[in-house]
Amino acid sequence: MTATKKIGILFGKERSFPMAFIEAINRRNLPGITAEPVRIDKVIQGEPSGYDVIIDRISQDVPFYRAYLKNAALRGTAVINNPFWWSADEKFFNNCLATRIGVPVPKTVILPSHDLPPDTSDQSFINLTYPLDWDTIFHYVGFPAYMKPFAGGGWKNVYKLHNAEEFYQRHGETGQLVMLLQEEIVFTEYYRCYCIGGKYVRIMSYEPRNPHHLRYEA
């Protein structure tokens, strides 16, 4: 008898996609395959997770889950997205990489956090010039511009800025977040690309102004 292969999905506040994904898998009645929300009651080093595949929708916000997923991957679970890429998967690095391989991206600069990070003082930043060269930064990016965290997603802490005065006001509200200032691109078409295993690619139309469940045209 073939052992059942379990697909788990790890998620947070969202409900529409995770539950629809689980229902779509189970509705197919594929022999030996079942899908469910990931259940975690303990995480012991080197022990398997009990899942053959885990779809990750939340570990970018929860360090505990990132550690859990890395342990699961080491024990043979296929984790989507790759948990070992998390440290490199931030917007500024991705933009820098794109510039090196010839992919057009919006003009972007990274900004130090407005407030000092924990356990630091002014003496921690003797290599950083204050004030920054704001004139050059604003001339390079232009206005309108968007300011957003350099890592993470979910459209959190994103600001549209029309001038330097708005920038200074909003930047003062961002606390210890490291932010990007990015050129506005007024798009006529918007696409997202999903790649699995560095091999399978799906390009999909995407409308970010729609409700979440109506954004993709797959």
Residue ranges of model-derived segments:
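Conserved N-proximal alpha/beta basic substrate-recognition cap immediately N-terminal to
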Residues: 12-124
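Short glycine-/acidic-enriched loop or helix-start segments at secondary-structure transitions
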Residues: 19-20, 65-67, 91, 156-158, ...
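Short, solvent-exposed loop/turn segments at secondary-structure junctions
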Residues: 14-16, 60-61, 86, 151-153, ...
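Phosphate-binding core of ATP-grasp and ATP-grasp-like enzymes
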Residues: 175-178, 184-218
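Active-site nucleotide/adenylate-binding loops and adjacent lid/helix of ATP-dependent enzymes
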Residues: 2-11, 73-76, 84-190
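A generic membrane alpha-helix/interface feature
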Residues: 24, 68, 94, 120, ...
